[in-house]
Amino acid sequence: MLEQAREQIFARGTEANARPAANAGAADAAANVTAFKPKPEQTDFDVIIVGAGLSGIGVAYHLQRDCPKKSFIILEGREALGGTWDLFRYPGIRSDSDMHTLGYRFRPWRGEKAIADGPSILDYLNDTAREYGIDRSIRFRHKVKRASWSSSEARWTLEVEGPDGKKVTYSCNFLQMCSGYYDYDAGYMPGWPGMERFKGEIVHPQKWPEHLDYAGKRVVVIGSGATAVTLVPAMTDKAAHVTMLQRSPTYIVARPAKDPIANWLYAKLPEGLAHTAARWKNILLQMYFYNAARKNPEGAKQRIIGLAKAELGPGVDMAKHFTPRYNPWDQRLCLVPDGDLFKAIRAGRAAVVTDEIEAFTETGLKLRSGEELPADIIITATGLVMRLMGGMELVVDGRIVKPGTTMSYKGMMFSDVPNLASTFGYTNASWTLKADLTAEYLCRILNKMDRGGYAYCTPHNKDPSVTPDATPPLSSGYMQRGKDAMPKQGSKRPWKLYQNYAKDMLALRFGTIDDGTLVFSKLSQRAGKRA
């Protein structure tokens, strides 16, 4: 199957062969994709996209390319596009996967570093939106509070809070949710005893103060996930010392920030071919290492720990600080570009403490072991709060629907919810790989409905042997805390999630839409046609 996927994709080529690169002019882009221009007062559209981040911009591009007659708008609750890459502003913010796969398939990443910093990624998103005219189809500070579906009208009605707090009503035939999976307003903050006693500053990375001065300060970062391992080395350039306080270790893997093979390909080959080769190299390598780790978890565990030990040098208690209790990919691996965290620890500018917090004190933290950990600044890199669809209330024909009570169809639609798709990327690879496939499949659905005169489509399980599974794809804290809010997966296709790009590509890009599960419907004669 994987070889078949490779042959098909290379035979077909990619849009990159005909699309401009990141540094190409807008004139070349306009020759390939015609930007949709909504009227200023228009509130009724064929498609409404909620969220102007990585996913939403990608969906807009695909609509313009594959469904050029469809009207659409992007409603963004914040004041700027970019989603995650505009929200998080902490030191060192960066990607934790390579930009050749986190970047769009239709627009090559041309930065020298494959592991890119947040501002560069945000520039890439802004440039993409501007280049394809998508920025003209975004309405900022528009928060969708409620979406109500009417089968008799084949229409979604959206209650939206506008820039001035005034309620505005929008409507569409198809609703595409690209609002992420976590609460943008607040991160997860455990309630530790004595927090009010601490005389220093307590900061959550999701609400990073613009002018936080940590020069010469003792900093403690609570957490061991991607945010923590990013913050610690980034802050050592100014801080007196940075300590990462973790309750338990995570798997940490060093990787070069620059991809020498990809950079060589871009130097030697035409850009489209180089983009395809670099992208598929990383896709296949990631799939190989993930599958190998799942088949031989103990071997993968020892390999990862051994590489970390070689980076850290002697004198580090590997069993205590760098040996997790779980297997690789039960939780997402943490990436450190060029081994920056290991270098900071080896140089004595940073340290890892594995313990639990008993209480905050006036001058730092008291740990369960009895140790006192002094701090001037404490950063709580304690994770996210799961919040699907931005907390929007979902109603179908007068019935409130909780996503957690539904099953996920092909990882993008909800059972028995018509004309709604939601982008949710991979947990074991770059988010955009699945986001791109979701956008492509959305366009295939829309075009099929137009060809057949259908008004809406609904994923409906007709197979009694399909059983729901509420187990989240990762055992990470935020996934466990939010598992009841997430749609369940089923025991077999098309309800089962494989977290596998090749399988999803075959299903979403090349597979049939008429799978017996996605039910297409026309408006009844009595309902009449919409004017």
Name the predicted role of every residue range.
Residues 102-105, 201-202, 411-428:
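Short FAD-binding loop at a beta-strand-to-alpha-helix junction that anchors the flavin cofactor
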Residues 109-127, 139, 222, 292-301, ...:
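Short beta-strand to alpha-helix junction loop
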Residues 7-27, 251-254, 263-264, 408, ...:
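C-terminal, flexible cofactor-proximal segment of oxidoreductases
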Residues 45-49, 54-138, 246-247, 310-312, ...:
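Beta1-alpha1 glycine-rich phosphate/pyrophosphate-binding loop at the start
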Residues 295, 303-393, 468-531:
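C-terminal catalytic lobe of FAD-dependent flavoproteins
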Residues 49-50, 144, 169-182, 219-222, ...:
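Short hydrophobic core segments
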Residues 37-44, 48-49, 54, 58-80, ...:
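Rossmann-like dinucleotide-binding core of oxidoreductases
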Residues 112-183, 311, 359:
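Feature captures the FAD/FMN-dependent oxidoreductase FAD-binding
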